[in-house]
Swiss-Prot record:
It comes from Rattus norvegicus. Zn(2+) binds at residues 251, 254, 383. Cleaves substrates with C-terminal arginine residues. Probably modulates the Wnt signaling pathway, by cleaving some undefined protein. May play a role in cleavage during prohormone processing. Residues 41-163 form the FZ domain. GO terms for cellular component: extracellular space. Inhibited by 2-mercaptomethyl-3-guanidinoethylthiopropanoic acid (MGTA) and guanidinoethylmercaptosuccinic acid (GEMSA). Inhibited by chelating agents such as EDTA and EGTA. This is Carboxypeptidase Z. Gene3D superfamilies: Carboxypeptidase-like, regulatory domain, Frizzled cysteine-rich domain, Zn peptidases.
């Protein structure tokens, strides 16, 4: 055939690529002619480890050349293997991270100690491959060659080390607990980062049918932002099941929320297994995401000062000295500008390109990508330093930015959400003179954020103006870093408010928007007359609209369809969302019958330095499988690596 020379040339090129991609035999071929396994240890010159992706490895020194024959930091950082480690948490939706990343680091930057390099243990690799292979299969990605458990990892008898020992570290206190403790036992103590990750992973393993952990990104110093999720089908969005998140430790020195969310995770797991009907109903009808520590780097600084320290600033910022609750895009100023113009939408406001010119923390980026990926309905951010629940807006509409009551269009609903927490909190309702934060008692321990003090760049305002999510801020107490003996009391005071708040996600209405053929309509608008704030449908056409009791006129519309209007009545004591579906009819050739609004959909301005724009932060499992001969969706992450693209990740 005429193409035979071309095929031979292509095969030769692929063979050359394979030789370049895989390290040579070490120390040499055995008598049978096969490649001998790498030695478990060998002499080397140890150098300091300088890889940001591997900054949280359990060792500080490595050596060159590496098992992949990289001979400099530049070669490692330019390699597709290193690029893969940096994006694994996005590709796998946080599954198996940071475990897989640290396993990869043990090959790309081998441990060097006392003039000898050491190989990681094969059993660790095999255990991770068994657990994580389904995650790779789900996105049609081959298992990375450099994580070959036979070639790059050593058996126990040859001497090896556990590359995940950092995750298993600092467990002496947990392991020393007496055996035979009841499954409901919770240790009310402060948790280091390693202990926190371990507790979350243990909890997810214990309740694997309803829980899993994942990472949404990494802090500036490389710590994974670990989330534990609870759902009847963990890892996937279910039709009309609302999504809710709780975030702690956005300020590193405000630690009560961090610990309370660790306790809450254990409580939900234990009570579910014990058959608590309230918890089982909650987990079977709600997808709950708990992020105990948004600022683990700041926590380390605060923890070094010790519990009880109340200096108000030590560890507050992240490692870049950025206040994360002032680091989000200021969409509130844009809202005030748009609100003065009739017929212009004031919801789902895009992020200005100017925002990316400033200093944006990796923790902030991780949160923004997270809430653009999952259709969150409700959220709370847990803080410390006072005893009050505040709600948006946090930025004042006063022309001189002074504190001033600045309500959102959903003022009534936000007050209901805030009261759902405060009204069942014993200390927030305490009328004694010794009560912390007593100046809020006359307000019912709730306040509009801007009426308290005004600031821009807050996370709550961003949630409301950029997405469908309603977020409140909970100040848990006047001591930012309470001593351990106070933690049990804090948990008891906040357990019922947290559960009551989580259940509030089932207030209002929910439903599905479809066309006349039953096909879901994505990004349809759900409008409520008298409330100038729309929500949009998720990819499956489902929506949730938090609403206070009363009568409402609800409208659904989408480009190319006629609008549909319905009147709904929400009873005062109704504790579950009413079902309101819409079937949209396609428009004819006449004038388009839309409600007043912008002439085009608001664009979503993405981080120009972040993930490829075509991915749009959708969950990997939502991607279509590639057509025959085309590349999978995740290939876009590696397009800049030509000619060294990781073709070894392709299955076909």
């Amino acid at each position: 055939m005429p193409t035979t020379p071309l095929l031979l040339a292509a095969l030769a090129a692929l063979a050359a690529l394979a030789v370049a991609a895989y390290p040579s035999c070490s120390p040499g071929p055995d008598p049978s002619g096969k490649c001998q396994r790498l030695a478990s240890t060998h002499s080397a010159t140890c150098v300091d480890l300088h890889l940001r992706t591997c900054a949280d490895a359990a060792y500080n020194h490595t050596s060159f050349p590496t098992p992949l024959e990289h001979r400099s930091w530049e070669a490692v950082e330019a390699s597709p293997e290193y690029t893969l480690l940096g994006v694994l948490h996005f590709l796998l939706e946080g599954q198996c991270n940071p475990d897989l990343r640290l396993l990869g680091c043990s090959v790309l930057a081998p441990r060097c100690q006392g003039g000898h390099t050491q190989r990681p243990c094969r059993r660790v690799c095999e255990g991770l491959r068994e657990a994580c292979q389904p995650a790779f299969d789900a996105i049609d990605m081959a298992w990375p060659y450099f994580l070959d458990c036979t070639q790059y990892f050593a058996p126990e008898e040859e001497g090896c080390y556990d590359p995940l020992e950092q995750l298993r570290g600092e467990l002496d206190v947990e392991e020393a607990l007496p055996s035979g403790l009841p499954p409901t036992f919770i240790r009310f103590a402060h948790h280091s980062y390693a202990q926190m990750v371990r507790v979350l992973k243990r909890t997810a393993a214990r309740c694997s049918q309803v829980a899993k952990t994942y990472s949404i990104g990494r802090s500036f110093e490389g710590k994974d932002l670990v989330v534990i999720e609870f759902s009847s089908r963990p890892g996937q969005h279910e039709l009309m099941e609302p999504e809710v998140k709780l975030i702690g430790n956005i300020h590193g020195n405000e630690v009560a929320g961090r610990e309370i969310l660790i306790y809450l995770a254990q409580y939900l797991c234990s009570e579910y297994l014990l058959g608590n009907p309230r918890i089982q109903r909650l987990l079977n009808t709600t997808r709950i995401h708990l992020l105990p520590s948004m600022n683990p780097d700041g926590y380390e600084v605060a923890a070094a000062e010790g519990a009880g320290y109340n200096g108000w600033t030590s560890g507050r910022q992240n490692a870049q000295n950025l206040d994360l609750n002032r680091n989000f895009p200021d969409l509130t100023s844009e809202y005030y500008r748009l609100a003065s113009t009739r017929g212009v939408r004031t919801d789902h406001i895009p992020i200005s390109q100017y925002y990316w010119w400033g200093k944006v923390a990796p923790e902030t980026k991780a949160i923004m990508k997270w809430i653009q990926t999952i259709p969150f309905v409700l959220s709370a951010s847990l803080h410390g330093g006072d005893l009050v629940v505040s709600y948006p807006f946090d930025f004042s509409k006063h022309p001189h930015e002074e504190k001033m009551f600045s309500p959102t269009p959903d003022e009534k609903m936000f007050k209901l959400l805030a009261r759902a927490y405060a009204d069942v909190h014993p200390m927030m309702m305490d009328r004694s003179e010794n009560r912390c934060g007593g100046n809020f008692l006359k307000r019912g321990s709730i306040i509009n954020g801007a009426d308290w003090y005004s600031f821009t760049g807050g996370m709550s305002d961003f949630n409301y103006l950029h997405t469908n999510c309603f977020e409140i801020t909970v100040e848990l107490g006047c001591v930012k870093f309470p001593p351990e003996e106070a933690l049990y009391g804090l948990w008891q005071h906040n357990k019922e408010p947290l559960l009551n708040f989580l259940e509030m996600v089932h207030r209002g209405i929910k439903g599905v928007v479809t066309d006349k053929y039953g096909k879901p309509v994505k990004n349809a608008r759900i409008l409520v007359k008298g409330i100038r704030h729309d929500v949009t449908t998720a990819p499956d056409g489902d929506y949730w609209r938090l609403l206070p009791p009363g009568s409402h006129i609800v409208i659904a519309q989408a480009p190319g369809y006629s609008k549909v209007m319905k009147r709904v009545t929400i009873p005062l004591r109704m504790k579950r969302a009413g079902r309101v579906d819409f079937i949209l009819q396609p428009l004819g050739t006449g004038p388009k019958n839309f409600l007043p609004g912008p002439s085009r959909a608001l664009p979503r301005s993405l981080d120009p330095q972040g993930a490829p724009a075509q991915l749009d932060f959708e969950p990997p499992r939502a991607r279509r499988q590639p057509a025959s001969g085309s590349k999978p969706w995740w290939w876009a992450y590696f397009t800049s690596l030509s000619p060294h693209k990781p073709r070894w990740l392709l299955k076909y």
